[in-house]
Every structure is written in structure tokens, then in C-alpha cells.
Amino acid sequence: CALGITESPVAGRRLAGNAALRRNSSLRVFVSGCPNSCAQHQIGDIGLAGSRVRVNGRTTDGYQVYAGADLDDHEIGVVVGRVAAEDLDAAVTAIVGTWEALRHPGESLGRTVRRFTPEGFSLQIQAALADRWAPGPEPAVAPVLVR
């Protein structure tokens, strides 16, 4: 798409080889190249919305990462953090690994995220990724008023 901030097809192909996702083939990962949600990133187990993101003081092309969706519970995902495009594979591995470590038997990723709260789950991911992960959504930038 000409509006894409990131190249979602490239990201999707890279993630197709992710070992953590291969171990958990029932997980649904939806990748949108921008916030317009053509791939409906809010309803994937892991949703990725292409965006300019700030991570560790650097602004770059990357993804706002959604988690917590569970269609059985009528829940959509929320932004749990931000990651640069080059660290996307590591972030998905950390998300899945965190879920594997924290989940109860048979518990979906969405239910695990909600049980820990999105903020608490994000802190677990940050512990794994250190300065390659920024918790929460991209901070809003106040508009500049010109007189």
C-alpha cells in the first residue's frame, strides 16, 4: 500500500519463520503497514501497526504492538509497546516466550495479557528486550499553534 509506513508483507514473511510462532501455530499475528488497520491488527493475538516510533530516545520506522485480543471474550487488543522494525522478530519471540512462561494451562495470550494487565505484561517484555522495547503507545504530540 502506498500509505504504509512499514513494509508489512516483508514483516509477515520474516515472521513466518519465527521459531516461537512455529511452536504456537494457533497464534494469529496481523500486520498492518500503518495505523489504518487494513489487516485488523486489533483482533490478532499479536497485532502490529506500522508507525514512526520512539524507542530508547531514537525515532524510527517500527510498530506499535497490540496484544490482549480474545474474540471468544469479545476483547480487542491494546497497545502494549513499541518496537523498531529491525527488532520485530525479537519482540515477537519475547512476547510469545513471556506468554509461554506465564500462561495457565489452556490460557490464551489475550487472557494472559489481561490477567497481568497490558502494562504488567509489557514490563515482562521490556525485561527481555531491554532498550529495544518501549512500553505503551506512542506518546501523543501536542499540536503546535501558529499565530
Map each language-model feature to its residues.
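Alpha-helix initiation and N-capping motif
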Residues: 12, 92, 106-109, 118, ...
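Conserved active-site and cofactor/substrate-binding residues in soluble primary-metabolism enzymes
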Residues: 6, 10, 83-90, 107
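Flexible, glycine/charged-enriched surface loops at secondary-structure junctions
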Residues: 23-28, 102-114
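Small-residue-enriched alpha-helical segments and adjacent helix-cap loops
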Residues: 1-58, 63
